[in-house]
């Protein structure tokens, strides 16, 4: 049976930390930033951990 291929798109969107947590960039920082308050844009910077219900599916897509 051939090897499973990891989902390329998911691999570009998330990163697995050394301890196995899956982190992603928060949504809402691509465009229309002029109308958003600077407090909101600051809050949206940085990486956040993926929600618990999604972890199992993402790990399957990544082949882990």
Curated annotation (Swiss-Prot):
Keywords: Ribonucleoprotein, Ribosomal protein. Residues 1-22 have a biased composition (Basic residues). Pfam families: Ribosomal_L35p. Coiled coil: none annotated. One of its GO terms (biological process) is translation. GO terms for cellular component: cytosolic large ribosomal subunit. One of its GO terms (molecular function) is structural constituent of ribosome. Residues 1-39 are annotated as: Disordered. The keyword Endoplasmic reticulum does not apply. Belongs to the bacterial ribosomal protein bL35 family. This is Large ribosomal subunit protein bL35. It comes from Salinispora arenicola (strain CNS-205).
């Amino acid at each position: 049976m051939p090897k499973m291929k990891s989902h390329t798109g998911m691999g570009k969107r998330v990163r697995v930390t050394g301890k196995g947590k899956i982190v992603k960039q928060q949504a809402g920082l691509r465009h229309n930033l002029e109308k958003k308050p600077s407090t909101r844009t600051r809050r949206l910077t940085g990486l956040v951990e993926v929600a618990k219900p999604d972890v199992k599916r993402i790990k399957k897509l990544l082949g882990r």
